[in-house]
Each structure stands twice: as C-alpha cells, then as structure tokens.
C-alpha cells in the first residue's frame, strides 16, 4: 500500500503548491480582459486523465487578444493542466471529472497569480457508446462512371480487400480491416473470374470474420416483380455451395424495399436487413436510426436496421480527417441520438474508403480508429461487420424492439417515369415471363424435355430486367449535362437491358409455344389454342394475329370447341399479311389450355357497325358513360349493377383527363420538399368520334391538342366498353416533345365512393394507403404492381395499367411529402411521365408512346377479387394459331394442375432446376387460414415440398399443407 501513498502525497502537495500560488494573487488581478472563454462544451465522451482515470472530455474556444502565453486550466478552482495560448482563437481540449449526475463545473484560465477567464460548463453522466464502423463500397451500376467500368472496379476492389485483411489479421479485433460486400453481383463475378487460390484467400477472410457477404444482388427499386426476385436471390445458391455464410440483406441509397423479401429472406437464413437511406427528395422513416422487427404480411419476422446515410462516416471525416478533427461531428451525431431517445448504447455507421460512390477500400480509416481509441475511453470505435452490431443489439435488447408489420414503399421510383417507354417494356416483359415460364411448366408437365440451357436463358432475361429495374438510372450529370457523352452512353446502356430482355423473352415465348404445339389437337382445319398460365380457370379477351392463308381477308369465320360452342370474336385491323382479331376465350383451365377449330365461311364478314353516340352518352349492360367535350374526359360513369355514380364531379379533373404539368422551370423545389410553382392544363380543341359497336366491345375516341406533345398528332384516347365482361379499357397515344424543362403527364381517375380506402398491390401483398406502410415511406406516389383498389364495405373499383407503374393516391400529391399519409377523397392519378429529378434519371423523353388502363367495379370487396382482376389483366391469356394439319386424337383441353382456393395466388411457376419438378410461388391474399393441395386434371393429389427461393427444403414431402393468413411459400411440385 505504501507504494501508492507516496506518489499521492507528492501529487496533492504539488497541486496544493500550484493552487496556493494562484489563489494568493486572485485578489490582485482576476480578469485582464485580453483572454475570454467564448464557448465551453462538455462532450459525450470520456478521455483518460493523467492517472488513467476516465474523465469527461471538454472542448473550449478561447480568445487571446494579446501575445502568446502559457496558462493553466483550473477545474472548480483546482489547477489541472498547463496549456499554451496563441494569439487569436484557440481550440482547447481538456477534461473534467466523470460524474454520475448533472452539475455545473467551473472552468477557469489562470496565469501566474491571475484568473484570466472563467465559465461554467454543464457536466453530465456520459453514455458509454460503441460505434460499429462498417466499411463498404456503395454499388451504383453507373452514375459516377459508365456501367462497363463499375464491375471491373468492384472485382478489383475485392483483391484489395483480401490484401488489407491479410495485412491486419493479427491486429486486435476492433482494429482489423473489415469489409462488407454490399451486393452479391460483384462477389459472384469475382468468384467466377479469379483463380482458385485467390478465391480461397477471399473465403478465408470471410470465415475469419473480416468480410461479410450480403444477400441482395444490388440495390433494387420496387419495379421488380416477385418472379424476377428469384433470380435476384439466385447467387445465394452459389454462395451456399462454397459454405459462405449470408446473414444480412443490405439495401443502400434506395428509400424502400420489396415487402415479399420479409417472407423470402428468413427462409434463406437471412434474418438481418439494413437500409442506408438517402433522404434526397425523400422522407426518412423514424426520428433516428432504428432497429425493429420487420414482419411480412403473414407475420414472419426479421430484424431491420434503418441506418442514416450510407456514407455517414465519410461525412464525419473517417476517410480524410484525424480523430480530433472528426470528433465534433461524432459528438454532434451522438448527442442528436440521445436527444431523440435512441435506446441503445451502440450504433452502426456505414462509410466508404473515399467519399464517393463505387469507392475503393482504404486502410486510412483503420488508422483513424486506432488514433481515436487511444485518445478516447468512450465512445469506442470498432472496425466491424454489420451482423456484429445486430448480434449485439438482438442479444441485449430483443425484448424491447418494436414490431412493425408494414410495407416500405420506395420514394425514388418516380424517376422511372422519366423513361416511360422503356419502363413499360420492362413491365410488359415481367408479365410475359410469368406466362412464358408457365408455358414451359406446362410443357414439363406433359413430359416434354426442355431445350438445353433453358434455365440459363431464363436467368439471362431476368438478369437484364433486374439491371433495368435497379436504382441507378444514368449519369450523375444526366440533368445538368443531358447531351454529354456520359449521360448519353449511360442511358444507352441502361435502356439496352430492357430491350434485350424483351427481345429474348419474345423468343422464349415462341420456344415454349413450340414445345407444347406438338401435343396440340390437329385436324383438317386450322386451330387456335388458348393458354392460361395462372392458377384458376379463366375467361377473357385475347388478341390474335391470323394470316390471310388461314382466314382470308374480310372472310366470315368462327371459332368453335369440340361440341360446337362458338366464341365471340371481333376484327381489330388488317394489313396485307393478315388481320388482328380479338376473341373472348371461355373457361380456359388453370395452368393449361383449350383448343378451338377455325371454321371459315364462304361469305364476306359483316362490317363492324359504327357506334351511335347520342348526347355524348354511351352505355352497355354494365355502365353508362357521359363524355365531357370541353377537356376530353368522362364526366359520368354510372355502374348499373351497383347503382352508383363512380366519378366525383367536384374534382378539377374528371375521369380519363389527360393532365399536362410544368414546374415553371424549377425542379429544385422538390428537393425543398414542396411543389408550389406549377401549372396544369388539359386538352383543348377536343373532338369526340365514334368507334365500333362490336360484338365484344363498343368504343369511342377522344382527341385533342395539348402543350408538351406534338401538335399534328395531339392526344388520342380510345375508350372500350366490353360486352362479355364487366370491364372498361382506356388506351392513350401521344407523341411527347423533348422538353428539357421539367414537365409531367397524369391521367385522372377521381373516384367517388363513401368512406372508401385506397389499396394497391406490391410484391408480397396488398397495402392500404397510409395504413400498413411504414410512416415516412413513399406517400406522394406509389409503385403499383397490378392494381389499385378503391374500396368500402359494399363496393370496390379496381384499376390498373399494364405499362404504367406510378400512381398517386388521394389526388395529385406531388410535393406534399406527408409523413403520415391522409387523404380526403379516393381520387387516383396515374403518373405517366416526368423529368423532375436533378440527377441520375432522364432529362427528357420524346416520341410516340401508347399506354392503357383496365377498370372494373364490383360488390365483392375482397383482396382476392382485386388480385385476380389485376393479375389476369397484366398476365393475359395467350393464343396460338396453327394451320390445318394431320389429324390426331390429342385432347382439346388440358390442365397440368390446379390449386383450390380463390384466395391463393400463384405468382409464378417455373421448371425446377431438378428434372421432374416445378417451382411454384404461392401466397394467400385474404387473411384466411387455407388448406393447400395440388391436383392434376383427374383429381389426383400431387406430392410437393415446401422450399425456399433457391429450392432448399424446409419441410418433408407431403400432399397437403396449411397457409397462414397472407403467408407466402415456395412449393417444389413433383410431376
């Protein structure tokens, strides 16, 4: 004990001597006026004192108007340390004793016998923080450089990462170089394109805990559909084969995420989500970074961390400052967390090696972390992997984490409206691939061997769709320099993904049809076979092109089934090669087909009569429509079955109105979270002309002029009222002028329905606008997969578009940025085009573009009804025409299998990678526990197994299962 007493005595004596000298002179000269403490701040940090005790870190801003001098800092009148003051403003670091309660501490500056300046500082208990610093490179497929450069850079970065891991593997855990691979895309390319020994080094440091692989291909918008998400997750299969663990799904920059991933990821063993959100033109959910339990519609749970920006650490200065220079930013951040009630003693921060996207890794931040931890006892910085932070939080705070069962809609998909044509191509191809993979599944069920390499071709198409749907749309200078080389070349590359997918999907659809046609019934007359690739029996309109060789032009014909029942048909248009018809195909079996004979008459076809429009009113058995000829819209839509008027006549824009908007050349206002400078206008010089009064539908045309589009073509709107089903279609065509100034196009659907709510479908489920969506997620506009529903207890109106994904619900809401969405009227606006961004997305679009809407109304208010109408409209029946041939006795109809339950939706069916199996993705839509079985056409039960998205088994083989409410499952079906 004696060895400690003597040093303490000497210490107290020296302090007492120093204090006595200063205090003795206090009365002579307390303040000179040349030195002043401008600011004294007790920071949320601890440092080590002169005897390794922990003390609260304090920063002082001291002004010295005189000459440089040496002074002492006193704490509550007791001298603590000597410092040098330069002339001018001095930034001083000192400390006060750590405290367990809030209190004022007196800080003074003394020189010799004088107290030169004095100020109280508020000391408080310091929270012991650990900051998990996660280094990564944000993967933009373009933006900062061309798409062709990005992948090679990221592959090379992994080489650097391996070197840095090796260099630091013997450091303490918190100082080892650690790296998070944000996307699986470059990881898989690295594995496939590096020598075996280099890949083995890479895997070594994954297993050494220095590299973390995440589970998402890259940062994805909500444009992607559930079918393509299987390909999006496919790299996990290859990672599994190499025994590479994947615990995390990471989404950076994007302000939302597909809800179905909350179902898919836990079954893949991925229980952590992270989102480094970018609040440019977007709200950020939650007051501060938040860990919560994110539930899928069925209640499947994962842990979700909403980061701040994905380069917050760079904003602090981790990549270009020292510890002292970085400290104010760190302390301000932690103080802000405390003020907002952040509940944990640890926080995770993302950063890159350098302060830009697609950054290479760097060891510099590790040196800063070392310097920081040598200086500060708290907060401690750790070089970390993301899952380490989540492991820490879940282990200590699991019971208090909030539970959120809600969708997370994305704010940034509005930019896809800057390329309406290519976005429409992407959406059309997604829908076509659902049908095509269904056709391949039917072929497999019939025992047809699939073409060699078919799975790789499917993957290639979906990969191209993924690259188009991915969040990086173009160059950083796409708006400021739209005609520059970078903007032009990046857009050419981006758009090529959509067109490449579309082209190959068309070929694959023909391949699939060709596989099945060898088992089609044939005979002495031509045939038409209608295919249904969804899981319920369907009837609907199918467009057919039939050569003049099969049906001579203007010749009467009929399509009849095996017992002579005739389908309703209608001519659309003809050319020198043949004619386009539509037919109403009836009762086509689920996952199957039905064949009709083409019987050609000797008489000429009766010309279609022209529709009679009286007093601008058109009606059929279901609806009565009144046209507003002033601005080319529908002012009344009366449902005869429901006995309701569907349109709000008080709306400034009536149903179908073409609304052209300009922002007075001020696109920056949306970055200020407002839209106050704008003009909106509709059609002028409107003309209404009749179309045909056909057997399948009646039609009329509205034509008019409008700013923003080519004058000689104007805007053409065709409205079709169908006779065989309760359905209206609106088809728009215009030629957009290439304006660089911000402008946009909406189409109005101002519905009227008392006490109505607004619903829309996303990947994985149905969202009630403003209700089961995370507060602060996209509320001005939403990305719709297949339908919008206006619904009360008695009725629902169902609307959708095959081409256009963006809808605004509750009115034109651009610029409102409502954190908790509310609306007064169930008005719906389709947002067709815009160029409102200041970067990344397109500055203009031009040329002819056609798009369409489908609409119905019903007294059935279920999700299942809306879902089936929307899906059947986006994924229509397909028809295949064959000439007369050698007669055979193949059956005229066929169903590979059926799934009972109108509330069970099969979102996709594709041949499994294992021969003799199909992979189905099925979800329950109405919130009901539902028994699940699969039967063949004869009623025999199929065996199946519950698997995950990459076909790993989750259950034993069975013939029945139970779906929980809203549950989503992958089914591996044995043929």
Tell where the protein language model's regions lie, with residue ranges.
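Mature N-terminal, pre-catalytic/accessory segment of carbohydrate-active enzymes
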Residues: 20-140, 148
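Bacterial Sec-dependent N-terminal signal peptides
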Residues: 1-24
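CE4/NodB-like, metal-dependent polysaccharide N-deacetylase domain
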Residues: 229-267, 332-351
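Surface-exposed loop and adjacent secondary-structure segments within mature catalytic domains
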Residues: 201-208, 258-321
């Amino acid at each position: 004990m004696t060895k400690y007493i003597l040093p303490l005595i000497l210490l107290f004596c020296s302090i007492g001597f120093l204090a006595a000298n200063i205090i003795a002179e206090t009365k002579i000269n307390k303040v000179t006026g040349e030195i002043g403490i401008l600011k004294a701040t007790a920071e949320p940090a601890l440092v080590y004192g002169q005897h390794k005790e922990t003390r609260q870190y304090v920063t002082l801003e001291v002004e010295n108007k005189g000459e440089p001098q040496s002074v002492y800092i006193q704490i509550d009148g007791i001298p603590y340390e000597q410092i040098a003051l330069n002339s001018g403003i001095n930034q001083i670091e000192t400390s006060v004793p750590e405290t367990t309660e809030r209190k004022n501490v007196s800080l003074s500056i003394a020189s010799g016998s004088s107290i030169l300046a004095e100020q109280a500082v508020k000391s408080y208990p310091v929270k012991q923080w650990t900051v998990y610093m996660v280094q990564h490179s944000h993967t933009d497929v373009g933006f900062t450089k061309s798409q062709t450069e990005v992948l090679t850079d990221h592959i090379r970065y992994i080489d650097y990462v391996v070197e840095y891991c090796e260099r630091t593997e013997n450091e303490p855990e918190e100082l080892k170089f650690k790296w998070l691979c944000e996307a699986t895309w470059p990881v898989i390319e690295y594995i496939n394109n590096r020598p075996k020994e280099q890949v083995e080094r890479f895997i070594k440091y994954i297993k050494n805990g220095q590299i973390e692989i995440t589970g998402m291909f890259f940062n994805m918008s909500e444009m992607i559909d559930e079918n393509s998400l299987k390909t999006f997750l496919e790299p996990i299969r290859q990672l599994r084969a190499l025994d590479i663990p994947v615990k995390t799904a990471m989404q950076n920059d994007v302000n939302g995420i597909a809800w179905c991933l909350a179902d898919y990821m836990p079954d893949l063993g991925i229980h952590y989500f992270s989102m480094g959100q970018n609040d440019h033109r977007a709200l950020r959910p939650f007051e501060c970074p938040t860990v919560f339990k994110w539930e899928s519609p069925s209640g499947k749970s994962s842990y979700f961390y909403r980061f701040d920006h994905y380069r917050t650490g760079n904003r602090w200065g981790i990549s270009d400052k020292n510890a002292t220079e970085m400290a104010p930013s760190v302390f301000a951040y932690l103080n802000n967390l405390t003020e907002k009630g952040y509940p944990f003693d640890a926080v995770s921060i993302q950063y890159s090696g350098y302060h830009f996207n697609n950054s290479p890794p760097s060891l510099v931040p590790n040196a800063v972390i070392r310097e920081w931890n040598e200086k500060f006892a708290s907060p401690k910085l750790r070089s970390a992997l993301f899952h380490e932070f989540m492991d820490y939080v879940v282990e200590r705070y699991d019971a208090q984490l909030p539970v959120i069962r809600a969708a997370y809609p994305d704010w940034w998909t509005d930019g896809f409206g800057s390329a309406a044509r290519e976005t429409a191509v992407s959406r059309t191809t997604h829908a076509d691939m659902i049908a095509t993979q269904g056709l391949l599944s039917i072929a497999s069920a019939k025992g047809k061997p699939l073409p060699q390499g078919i799975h790789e071709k499917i993957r290639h198409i979906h990969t191209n769709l993924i690259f188009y749907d991915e969040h990086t749309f173009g160059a950083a200078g796409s708006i400021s320099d739209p005609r520059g080389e970078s903007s032009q070349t990046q857009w050419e590359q981006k758009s090529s993904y959509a067109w490449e997918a579309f082209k190959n999907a068309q070929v694959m659809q023909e391949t699939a049809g060709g596989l099945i046609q060898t088992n089609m019934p044939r005979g002495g007359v031509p045939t038409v076979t209608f295919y249904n690739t969804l899981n319920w029996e369907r009837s609907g309109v199918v467009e057919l092109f039939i050569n003049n060789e099969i049906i001579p032009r203007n010749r009467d014909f009929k399509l009849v089934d095996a017992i002579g029942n005739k389908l309703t048909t209608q001519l659309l248009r003809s050319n020198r090669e043949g004619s386009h018809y539509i037919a109403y195909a009836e009762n086509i079996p689920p996952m199957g087909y039905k064949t009709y004979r083409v019987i050609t008459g000797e008489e000429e076809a009766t010309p279609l009569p022209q529709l009679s429009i009286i007093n601008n009113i058109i009606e059929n058995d279901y609806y009565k429509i009144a046209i507003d000829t002033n601005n080319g819209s529908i002012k009344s839509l009366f449902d005869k079955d429901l006995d309701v008027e569907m349109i709000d006549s008080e709306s400034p824009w009536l149903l179908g109105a073409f609304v052209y908007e300009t922002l007075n050349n001020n696109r920056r206002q949306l970055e200020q979270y407002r839209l106050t400078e704008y003009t909106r206008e509709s059609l002028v010089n409107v003309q209404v002309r009749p179309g045909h009064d056909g057997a399948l539908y009646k039609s009329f045309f509205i034509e008019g002029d409008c700013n923003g589009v080519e004058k000689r073509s104007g805007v053409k709107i065709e409205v079709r009222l169908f006779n065989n089903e309760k359905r209206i279609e609106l088809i728009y065509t215009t030629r957009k002028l290439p304006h660089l100034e911000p402008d946009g196009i909406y189409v109005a659907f101002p519905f009227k329905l008392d006490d109505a709510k607004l619903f829309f479908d996303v990947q994985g489920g149905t969202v009630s606008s403003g209700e089961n969506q995370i507060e602060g997620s996209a509320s001005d506009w939403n990305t719709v997969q297949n339908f919008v529903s206006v619904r009360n207890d008695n009725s629902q109106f169902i609307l959708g578009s095959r081409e256009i994904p963006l809808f605004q619900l509750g009115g034109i809401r651009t610029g409102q940025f409502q954190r908790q969405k509310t609306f007064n009227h169930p008005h719906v606006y389709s947002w067709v085009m815009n160029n409102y961004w200041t970067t990344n997305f397109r500055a203009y679009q031009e040329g002819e573009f056609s798009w369409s809407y489908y609409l119905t109304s019903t007294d059935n208010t279920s999700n299942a009804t809306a879902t089936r109408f929307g899906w059947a409209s986006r994924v229509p029946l397909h028809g295949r025409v064959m000439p007369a041939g050698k007669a055979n006795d193949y059956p005229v109809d066929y169903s590979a299998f059926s799934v009972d339950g109108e509330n069970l939706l099969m979102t996709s069916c594709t041949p499994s990678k294992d021969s003799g199996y199909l992979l189905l993705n099925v979800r329950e839509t109405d919130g009901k526990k539902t028994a699940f079985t699969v039967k063949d056409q004869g009623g025999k039960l199929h065996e199946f197994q519950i698997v995950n998205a990459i076909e790993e088994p989750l259950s034993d083989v069975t013939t029945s299962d139970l779906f929980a409410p809203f549950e989503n499952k992958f089914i591996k079906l044995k043929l």
